[in-house]
Amino acid sequence: MDETVAMASRGRALEWQGTSPWSIWRSVVINKSRMRTMRQYNLPLLENVRTVGRFGMPMLEEQDVTAPETLIGFNYVAGAKKQSRNCGVHFFIDDYQFSRVWNQPERYVVPLGRFQCVLTPDFSTYMDMPEAMKIWNVFRSRLIGAYWQACGLKVIPTLQWAGPESFSYCFSGIPSNSTVAVSTVGCHNDPTAELYWRLGMEYAIDRLAPERILLYGDAIPFFDFGDTQVVAYRNSNVERMKKWAEEDQARAQDTEADPPTCRP
C-alpha cells in the first residue's frame, strides 16, 4: 500500500477510535451524499479554476486557436468523420440537444478532441428569463469551457448576452485580445433582438477587444466590427432547409411534368 494512503488510513482509524459504528456509518453516508450533490452541480470541475467578477465566473485561459474552415453543430458530432481537424464544433442549437455535456461533461472530451476546436456551450440567456437563470447559464458555459481546456481541448469562448442589464456579468471570464464566437441566429426577423445584438456586440468589442470573431449566421446589416478580424460561417441549418425546399420543389415539378397515365 502506498505510504501516504497507509498514513491516511491510520489517521482515520485513530480519529474514529471510541466512536460508535453508527456515527462512523452516518459520517460516510453524509460525505457520499455531499459529493453526489457537488457532482450534480459540477462543483469538482472548479478545482484549479480561477474565478472572477461578482458572480465568480470561471476564467478561461487565453489560447492560440486558428479559425477552423467549417463549423458543425454538436448534434452532428457523432456522425462526423473520424478525422475532423479542420472543423470546429458549435452549440448554436436548442439547449436540449446539448444539455448532456453538462450532465456528463467527461463523456464528450474524447469525441470533441477529434476536432480542431470547440466553442463553449451556448446555454440560452433569453430576455424573459429570470436574471438568476441567465447568470447560471453563463456560469455553466464558462465552467464547461474551463474544464475542456484543462482536458487539453482548444476552446473558443461563445459570446452570449440578453439586454444591457446582463452586460455586467455575461462577458466575465473571457480573456481579452482572443478569438471569440457569436451567432446572429434569431436576430434578423426580430427588431428588438437585433437592437440588443448590436448593443451587446459593441459592448463586447469595447470590453474584450477580441483579435478575431467567428460569426455564425447572416451578418447584421451595416454593423461595424472596426479593426477586428471577422470569419463568417453560414448557418448550416438554414442551408439544409433551403436544400430540402429546393428538392421538394424539384420533385413537385417532375410530378407535374409527368402526370400518371391511366390504363384502359
List each model region and its residues:
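Eukaryote-skewed repeat-based solenoidal scaffolds used as protein-protein interaction platforms
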Residues: A78-S84, V89, V101-D248
